């Protein structure tokens, strides 16, 4: 386990590009993932973050909205994805791929997953929220990653891609990807 001081140092390092200040320790979270909980101010606004006591991973981060959003949704979509990847990398989640994103109310939610041996690892998802107007990270949840991420032995697909294309109910399937998906909370 890391100390509260080490957790605060991790927080300071992750949010250094956002000019973090006024960090306050709130207490310890005792959920499924044991955390040190903090509030702070930054260029993004008033924020809350949880750092895992085991390993020092950023588990949860959220910023209260402070301004009206008015970015072009099309332009924001692509740049928000890039901002999400960059922030995830800054927080220690490297080599992540965008698997889904959406935009509403001036905020983008971007779902990122790691890849291993050409397979998308959906159980290890990290969700990042980006403010569209300035591409500022305002949220992150890595609880699934924290609980599931490990090196896996990826088996060959049970169903060949050509067979899978014939099974799906979509008329025009342009490509297929190998994916590891969660199955009933306890299997993949």
Task: Report residues per predicted region.
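Long, terminal "pre-/pro-" and other extracytoplasmic accessory regions
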Residues: 1-188
